[in-house]
Structure formats: structure tokens, C-alpha cells
Amino acid sequence: MASQRSDFAPDLYDFIESNDFGEDPLIRAASAAEEGFTQPAAPDLLYGSQNMFGVDDAPLSTPVVVIPPPSPAPEPRGGKAKRSPSAAGSGGPPTPAAAAQPASPAPSPAPGLAAMLKMVHSSVAPGNGRRATGSSSPGGGDAADPVALDSDTETCPGSPQPEFPSSASPGGGSPAPRVRSISISSSSSSSSSMDEDDQADGAGASSSSSSSSDDSDSDEGGEEETPRPRHSQNAAKTPSAAGSPGPSSGGDRPAAGAATPKSCRSGAASPGAPAPAPASAPAPSRPGGGLLPPGARILEYLEGVREANLAKTLERPEPPAGMASPPGRSPHRLPKDQRPKSALAGASKRKRANPRPRPQTQTQAPAEEAPQTAVWDLLDMNSSQATGAAAAAASAPAAASCAPGVYQREPLLTPSGDPWPGSDPPPMGRVRYGGTGDSRDGLWDDPEIVLAASRYAEAQAPVPVFVPEMGDSTKQYNALVRMVFESREAMSWLQNSKLSGQDQNLAQFCQKFIHAPRGHGSFITGSVANPLPHIGDAMAAGNALWALPHAAASVAMSRRYDRTQKSFILQSLRRAYADMAYPRDEAGRPDSLAAVAGCPAQAAAAAASQQQPEAPAPSVRVREAYTRVCAALGPRRKAAAAAAAPGTRAPRPSAFRLRELGDACVLACQAVFEALLRLRGGASAVPGLDPSEIPSPACPPEALCSNPAGLETAALSLYELRDLVERARLLGDSDPTHRLGSDELRLAVRAVLVVARTVAPLVRYNAEGARARASAWTVTQAVFSIPSLVGGMLGEAVSLLAPPTRSQQPSSSSPGGEPFSGSAAAEGSLQTLPPLWPTVPGKQSATVPSSHSQSPQHSQSGGGAGATTATCCRATQTNARSRGQQHQPQKARSPQAAASPAHLSQEAMPGSSSDDRAIHGRPRGKSGKRRSEPLEPAAQAGASASFSSSARGYDPSGPVDSPPAPKRRVATPGHQAPRALGPMPAEGPDRRGGFRRVPRGDCHTPRPSDAACAAYCPPELVAELIDNQLFPEAWRPALTFDPQALATIAARCSGPPARDGARLGELAASGPLRRRAAWMHQIPDPEDVKVVVLYSPLQDEDLLGGLPASRPGGSRREPLWSDLKGGLSALLAALGNRILTKRSHAWAGNWTGAPDVSALNAQGVLLLSTGDLAFTGCVEYLCLRLGSARRKLLVLDAVSTEDWPQDGPAISQYHIYMRAALTPRVACAVRWPGERHLSRAVLTSSTLFGPGLFARAEAAFARLYPDSAPLRLCRSSNVAYTVDTRAGERTRVPLAPREYRQRVLPDYDGCKDMRAQAEGLGFHDPDFEEGAAQSHRAANRWGLGAWLRPVYLACGRRGAGAVEPSELLIPELLSEFCRVALLEPDAEAEPLVLPITEAPRRRAPRVDWEPGFGSRSTSVLHMGATELCLPEPDDELEIDGAGDVELVVEHPGPSPGVAQALRRAPIKIEVVSDDEDGGDWCNPYLS
């Protein structure tokens, strides 16, 4: 009760401080008034009907300024006041003294009140006359305050009252009975408390002061009815036209929001103001007949002023930024973030009696210098409507006669009508956090918070992590509400939003410094997810709409619902909050217009506000266009078709027109995107282009095929959106009404995405055909042609792209050209859409098309002679014209031509081929060969198949550069080859048919599209396609798992029939097809496959190898080298434990034959390339076969994301799947060629294809196959290459020492030329060239081409992307280890992996040669530089003579002593020459 009784105290004290009323003068004046200083002879000029500062004319525009922090109020003089019935609330019955109060009029106390006001003004500026303009008082008063008058000349505006008498002291005079006591206190928690009796007095004061002109006599709290002045309802509602209400009772005062004459605000009488009342005017009296006591008059006066100011503050919007307040008005009392902005004027007295002031945080500037930072804000997310209504109220003062706030949404309060607990702003330096009313220290100065605040200020979408220090939460709340209504994954984003690096740092910062110090994981924070602001902001604003994100996030966090149930709850929340988020009346207008319909002035202002930039007409048009798009493509068309008359069949549009409409929609989408990119300057600035916001199709493809009108409407709507965006770009800077905000642009993008995802199946998910048919490109191509052709091509393009007219359209009875865009006459025409190329608007020709117009010939079924139509074959025709070739028209492929083949005889078209079929209607190259891309699945045969090529950007009937090659198969009349692929049967696929077997459940890789899953090949065709010796019988079932592979094989079956009754021709096994099918010969039996390695080869890399074209007899092109992207060469180098460089044997450019991977195949490892035939089918076949046998397949994926094929294999999570990056940059010699000390080092981690991944794979293999031999992936024996060496052009390396001696030494047996022997055997060559053994002594010991093993540095995930060697932070000892280490070739040695963060714990291995057999140092040639690696004991370089043949030993031990013990026996080498000059000392056969 105590909190309810002191409601008036803070407002009274705020008013006193805002008007520079000092505490001491006011106390003295109030005491003097209560003690009864009276002058009966003086008339009551203050409370007469003079329309100046009377209770009946309370000044509505009394200046109000931002208040300073309130301080404890002093107790009234005289000690505790005795309670009177008028001041008692619900304390008890009236006292006898109050009952005996006389009802006769008492002497007028006006002189005492005038003296009090005189004393107050004298205390503010004693003896200084009028206050200087521009000065600021300590209390923060307004220098331009009209109340601050000259204290030497006037006591009150318009009052001739004499100066205050000298006898009027606070302690003098005969005291009058005190009927009411004022208790002034502060609502701040720091104010001092009063005694219980004083608080009771204050309660009575607040009870009467919190009442309004139209409230009831009693409060909800049960306070007793107290006699107090009541105003006249009529007087409050209908003031006098002249501005003077006339004589009225003293308790009458205007209602909040009533109009006030200008003289009342300025403090001086205007010419139009009424004259002061005569001195004999009756003094105001109580309703019971008694006059108001002086203290009660002060209370009522100040109460009226407070209520009037509160009402005007709530009614009046904030002036625009940078403009000063009007004369007589001051800025708002508080900034918008420190005061509730709800419309409290028309609410109950509880709502208007708790303004909740916020402590001032900075020094108050004078009113004329204070910046206008407050913004008029409503508790509504529709800020445009609120701003328009506020502007209407400001521009139409006459609208104040209506009830204030009728156009504002009622704030959400407690059931008892009170503000929510904890709605008060947090104390200075703290922000909301935790439960109701709790807070924490603010962290505004932390760098993470500063960066987050800057990102929040620039963000257009909701930020994933929000803290109160980032700023006003209104923007975040509105963005969250918008996202809940617009995003498909709203709940997922609220619960698990994707965090960038900066947002992740902010989330970690909040967890460490905000959440962690305050308790366990279930403590109350006020927001259930990171993006949500504290719920206290919504409670303080009373905005029920802001609770929507909290409700959605709470459901998203719950584990008691599954995804479908949560989706239902989200849809329910959207429907429940829809009217609140997007308010509209019955006529579809915003709330602001419907709310002010009863007030003409506000209605006119609100109607005018619709033309403001906040609610422009283009935004409405954007929304209407989006609505039309959704309605045109929606599934309701199917229901309308089903409701047609029974027995009638709706006409189905032709496939040609559907394709025309699809291309038109594609071009319309592209036009909108171009306009958006020009408007915003880039795709990143266009809102809505987010993968998470891609909508689902509006209807299935089958419903779209029966809705051509919807396609046309959607295309027209998109072009309207394009025009709106262009107007915004061209006129937005000069005319704000044409601007489009982020919400409108997001809606436009969404309209384009809805059309795109719906029409995509109609154009076969390919926009190339529509781009090729853009009419503007045809004109552009014409004007860019050579000078001899520019005139003719431009004229042809202009004539063919002429706009269609009604006169050009043929009637149904006349034989003529087709209507616009090639559709039938009965189906209408797309007259409002841009023309597509080629279009025939009615041009007729009776002759054969010339070379300038090679076209198919269309014929009408009802006409006589077939009329020809002219089109242009674009790219091929231009190329042919430039060469001066003559073309012959080919056979037309169109529905009209197929319907009437009599008009397309062979005599009329000599260049056509009789066996041209629709299935082969694909482009041909210069050699006449068909392209080898697979045929696309089609659900319809016949006419629809004939247009599959035109939708992809080329004209199947266009001429080619050279005549096509003759067919190897002669088709019989009427024979037509069957289509390899077709739609999935309705009854389901046959188990022997060709189709995708996608596993159920979750997969490691993306699942294929519906179109790929719908492709089907009949079992009889499958058996005929795979029955070929090129495909091993054990692997043929894998082909049935890949319809794309079957289509590729069918495209190659162009030879004569293999046997009688065959439907297809014999398969022509070309070289490329053999290379793509070579993987089937790696492992004969699919049951033996245990590990599958997936990779993406570079250009011209394959396991068949071959001589490059630069060599005689070579046919293979040299592969391209890439430092960034790894292919087959990088894969084999990693599996073979060696370094890949461009000059090494490991690169495919140096191969002269196929690499040998039989050692890997023997372990059950299958290497599969994305370019191999049936790549997808093989993986899914192995997964199905091994999974059926309860075995798990180990899949190592080295394919990059951009190289993963569309509709690639779906690998079930039942199997083991490991993915790593494959790149040559793992070798330090490739990444940092200048770092010589790291030339033999290779980086590795679990994310790189190398020993880090292989260790995981080997461990998994050991668990899957414990009885099998361990998997050995990183061994030199796994891979062997075929390269050019001195042993032959196609030498398999490494060549074993025995085989090396057998192949090389006989060639030099008996040779007398020692120089030729030295050069042939490589006596003077470096021991190792690019890592491979090259010299004679190295080849004789380890084998020719045996490679040095690298040192692997485990760098972790971050080190794998290091740009500079310094980023690795390699210890100095480890760097020295890599420089001197020389790991000799060993086919079975495991990889040497060293952690990059530690120094090595062993000595670097080196190679030691036996003394007396040449140099003890090992020469290594790398990147054109030779390096000499010395043994450990040698300190200086040893130089030997030329021509020495040495015996070698190994030094593998940790110390020289151990090395001598483990030294091998000398290897004997045959004498290579019997020359006497050579000497016998190096002959190992001599003792």
C-alpha cells in the first residue's frame, strides 16, 4: 500500500525541479499559505475566470525538461500533519473536527498563494529583473521558461497583486485549520524514508492527485471516497469558442488533451484573449459550499499542471531532428529509451500515475541547445504506421479534441492494470539480466562489446548474439519477429544460429564473463537463446508482440517435441500473432486509418501521412506483386480444375507453349536480379539472397503444366517488380516516395525465388536455353558482326522481333503463321511479355528459306500449302557466314512437323537425314560425332522430347559447319530406336532395371535429386546395354545402379545390330570409354573390396597412362600441373610415401605408361575416380552389397566440394566415411620452394590426405577385419610408375637392383669407351635426382628410380593452411633435423611422422658410403640445385676423383659405433671394362 500511496510525490517533485523551484522558498511559501496569510480586501485574481493560471484553465504546455536524479524530499514544516477526511484514503472514519467544518464561504486565500508564487520567483532571481536568455540554472530549468517573470514588477501573469507584505513570514500570522498535508518524496531507491504518519499523508495526496477528469471516485485499491473538486463534463468536452469558459466552480479544470489558448502558454494576454474578471468575482468554492484550503489549492493546481503536461507529452510527437521546440513547448521529459511510450492518456489512473522517471546520466543542457534526440515511438513493430499517425497528430492541432492515443495499440499490462514488476530501468551503470528486476554491471568498454555494437548498428537482419550493451533492443526485436514470420528455419536459427568468427568470440566472451560467474546452466537469464534480448525490455514497453521470439525459442529449445510438432506450434504462433504483427481493417487498410476514422482531422492527417516515405506506394505494390505470384503458382489451381463440370476435359497446353512460358519466367527472374544488383551495387548487399531463405516450390511440376495462365501472371508480376526496383534506383534519391527499403527488396527477392524454384523443373533445371533466347542478345550479336553482315543481320533481327499486333495474328480459319511465341491460336498469345528468340509474329514466306534464314517449316493442319516461317540460327549461322559456306536446310523438329510429315519430304530437304530421330536431337560437332553426355530422363515421349534441346540454348535444326558424318547404321523405314531412359513405372521399378538405389536414413554425402531418382531404364534394355566384353561380368550389376551410365552406353550404341532382334546397335568401344571403364579391372570380385578411395583427377589423368603426344607414337595429351589442386598424381604420391613435384616420377606428366597399383588392390583398396563410368553406381552398389552381408565399407573421400558430381553417390552412415583434402601443397618443396631446409618435409594432419588420415583408416580397418593382414596405405611398395629412364623408355620404377644390372650392364660389356660407359651408367650423375635414385651406385644398391622417403610434420588443422613457414613455429632442432635427414629408400618402411611442436628425440638418419669407394657424401639434385649430404662424423667436405665406383654401407644406428657393427658386407659389382688404363683396384671379382 505504501508504494501506491506515494504515486504523486515523484511527479510533483519533478515538476518543482523542472521549473527551478527551490526547496526552501517553496517550503516557506507552502507553510505561509497553510497558516492562513489573507488579505480580505484584495480580490481573488488567481482563481477567478480570467483564463490565466486558474484551475479551470490549467496550462497544457507548461515547459517540461529532462529531470535530474531526484533527491530525498524534505519534511514539511510544522512536523507531522494531522490527517483530515479530505486527505484520508482508506484509513478510517472522518474526524469530528472535519465534520464540524463550516459550509459557509471562507475568506479568499488568493493573496497568500500570490505571495507564495511571488516569493518563489523572487528566490530564483532576486533583484536581477527578468532572467537572462540562455542561462541555465542548477536545476536544469529552461531559460526560455515563460513562468520566469520579472519579480520586481509582477507577482503573477496578469495579476495587479501588490508585493508580498513584510509580515508574511513562515512563522507569523494566525494559523488556519490545516486540512491537508503534502508529502514530497522520491521514487528512487536511494531516497530517505519518512515516518509512517508522513507516508500516510502522502498516500492521501497521491490518491487524489492520481485521479483524472473522467475517472471514478474510488480506486481499485479500496480507498475511501473523498470529497474533492470535480470538473464539469460539458465544460471539459466543449470549451468556449472564444477561449474563455466563463464562470465555473473552483474544481473545474479541462480534460487532458483539451485545447489551450496561446495566451495561457505564453503567459501574456493576447489581443484576442478575454479581459480579466472584475475584482468582485466570486471565489471558487467547494461542492459542499466551502472554499478550498490554501494547501489543497496548491495541490490541485500542481496536479492539474502535471496531468496536463503528461497528456500533452503523450499526445505530441517529437519534432524532427535538428529543429528547435516551438515557442511555449519544450522537448520531451525523457528520452525514448528511458520512458514508456504507450498511450496512457486514455487508460485508468493506475496507468497514468506511474510515469517511472529514469535518472539522468549526463548534464542537462539549456533547452535551446539541447539536441532533439528523442524519437516518437509506439509499442508497435509497424513503425511506419506509428510515424504516420504521429505526424498527423502534429500537423493537425484540431485533432486534439479526439481522445488521445486512439490510434495506438493498448500496451500489455498486468491483470490489475499495473505495469509489470521490474519494468523500471536498471540503475545507472547496469543492464537487465536475470530474473524480474535483476541487473548486472554493464560492459560497454570491453572491445568485444564495442565491435558487437558496431556490427549491430550496421546489421539488417537479427544478430545471432545480442547483449544489452549493444544498444536499443527494439531493432533486434523487430528483426526477430520478422524472421519468425518469414524464415522457414526460424526455430532452428533461434536455437542453433550459425556463428561467424566474431560472433563466436562474442558468445564465448558472454559465456565466460556474463553467464559463468552467475551460477549453473539452468539459472534464470531472462532470454532463452543468444539472439533474444532480455524479456524485461518487452515487459517495460508492454509490447506483447515481442514475446513471440521468446515463445518460439522456448519451444525450439524443448526436447519434448519432434520437428513436426515444433513446426505445428510455430505455425500456430504465426497465426495467433498475425493480426498483431500485420494489423489491417476490413478494407485492408492499416490500423492507423481505421483507428482515426471517427475523427475527421486525424483521418485527414493520417490519409496525408500515407504519402510519407515511411509508407510509400511502391512497398504496397511490391507486396501485391508477391501476392499475385504466390496466388498464380499456388496449388489451388488443381482444386479449381477438379471442380470443373463433370464429363468435360480441360484443354492441356502444348509442350511448346509451356517451354516458351518457362523461358519467359527465367528471363523475368534474370531481369529482376539485374535491377537489384544495379540498385544495391552487388549481390552481397541484396537482402534475401541467403541459402537459408530459399523457399520451396509453390506447386508440383504436374500442376504447373496445366496452369499456363499462372506462369504468364507470374512473369508479368516479376517485370512489374523490375520496374519498381528501377524506379527506386533512378528516382529514389530525389523523390523519397519511390524508395524501397530492405523489407521490400527482401520480398521482391523472395518472389523471384518462388518463381525460380517452381519453374525450375519445367526448364529442366537449366537456364542456358532461356539465356540464348533473350531477344536483346540477338540484336547485340547483329551489331557486333563483321561489316559485310551487320546490315543484313540487324535488319533480320528487327523484322523478326517486331511487336505483335492484332492484325498480324492469324484467325482460326485462315492458314498463316503462328501467333506470337509459337503457341497455337486457340491458346492466346503473350502480348505483354518481351519477345523471345526465335519468334514469328506473322511473317509469311512461300519460298524456301534463304541462307540468311535457315528455319524449320511449320504447317497448319487446316491450311492448304505449308507456310514456311523464318528463324535465325544464331551462333552456327554466324560462323558459317563468316566462312562463306552454303547451308542446306535440315529436317524440322517441331510438333507441327511431326504431326504432318507430308510437307517435309526428302525432295524438299535434300540435306536432311532419314534416320534423324528425336532421341538424337542433340548438337553435333565439326566431326559429326555426337556428344557423349548422357541422355536426360524425360517423362513424356514424342513432342516434348523434341524440345529438350531447344531449352538448352541451341537450335537442333540449325546448320552446322560441315555435313554430318554418315550413319553407320541404316535404319529401316518406320524403325525408331527406343529411349534408354524413361519415367519410373507407377507400379514400381523392376529389380533388373536400371535406377538409383538410394539407401534409407541419413547419409554422409548429399542425397540425389528427385529427377535423378525418377530416371529408369527398362530391364530388357539394361540387359542389352551391359552385355559387352568391355564390362567384366562381376561388375555389370554396378552399371544397373547408375542410369546415367546406361544412357552414356546407349549413346555409343550407334553401330549395326549385334544380333537379330536387338533394339540397339553394337557398342563402339572408343578410347575414352575404355579409360572410363578401366577401374573394373582393378579387383576382379566386388566381394574383395574393403576400402574405396574416391578422387577427382586433373585433366588427362587416368590409371591407363600412356605416352604423351609430344613423343613419337604418343596420343595422350600432357596433363596440366596445379600447385593447389590435387588429382591422381597427388593421390598415388601420398599412398606411395613419396614427395610429388613437377619433375618427379610421381607426376602424371612424366608417365609413359600406366602406374601399377596392384599392391593396393591386393589389400582390397579400390581407386575410383569421379570421371569413371558408373562412379555413382559403383559406390552405391558396393554399399548395398556389403551392407547386405553385414559388412561395413571403408570410404576415403579425397574429392573437393566443388568437384563432387551433381547427384553423386549416397553413402549411408552405416558405413565408415572419412574425408580429407588432397593437394600438392602438403610438400614444403611445392609450398615454399625457397626453404631449402624443408625440401624433404611434408605436412600432414587428420584433414589432409596423408599419414594422418591413413592412421585413422588403418585403425578402423583393424577393427573391421581383425583376422586380415593389417592395412598398409603409406608404403613405397604400394605404387610403381612407368617412366623414361636410361634403362628404357617404359621402365617400371623402382627397378630392382638385380633387374637393373641385367638390363643395363650387358649393353656396356666389352665397351672400350670409358666416357660412354660413365655417361651410360651415370657415374657422375647425382645419387638422387628429384628424390629418385639416379647414379649407378645408388641404383645398384636400392634400384633405379627408388625414391627417398620424406619426413612428415604433424602440423594440425591450422598448420595445414599456413602461408609462411614462420606460422608453423618449427623448433630450431626440428628444422635442423629436416635439413640433414636423408631417409634411404625402403619399400616396407612406415612413414616417419614428427610432431611439429616438439624437438626430435632421435638423431637424423643419414646415408653413409664405404670409404675407398668414392665420395662419402650423398649428392641430391632438387629444383636444379645439387646438395651434398655429409655423414655424421664428417666435418669437412670430401672430394674424390672422377670415375670412382664405390661400395656403399648404411649408417642407420643412433651412434657411429653401432653403425660400424651393423655395416653390411660389400656388394660385388661386375667389371664394366677391360681397359688397361682403368686399373684393377676397383674390380670386385679380384681378391
Swiss-Prot record:
Biased composition range(s): Acidic residues: 214-224
Cellular component, GO, one term: host cell nucleoplasm
Ranges annotated as biased composition (Polar residues): 878-893
Chain intervals with Basic and acidic residues compositional bias: 988-1007
Subcellular location: Host nucleus
Molecular function per GO: DNA binding
Basic residues biased stretches: 920-929
GO biological process, one term: positive regulation of gene expression
Lineage: superkingdom: Viruses
Keywords carried by this UniProt record: DNA-binding, Early protein, Host nucleus, Phosphoprotein, Transcription, Transcription regulation
Pro residues composition bias: residue spans: 66-75, 273-285
Modification after translation: A long stretch of serine residues may be a major site of phosphorylation.
Segments of this protein annotated with the region Disordered: 41-295, 310-371, 409-442, 803-1007
Record field: compositional bias (Low complexity): 165-193, 201-213, 235-272, 807-829, 849-860, 867-877, 938-951
Chief location: host cell
Family: Belongs to the herpesviridae ICP4 family.
Function of the protein: This IE protein is a multifunctional protein capable of migrating to the nucleus, binding to DNA, trans-activating other viral genes, and autoregulating its own synthesis.
Name recorded for this polypeptide: Major viral transcription factor
Organism of derivation: Equine herpesvirus 1 (strain Kentucky A)
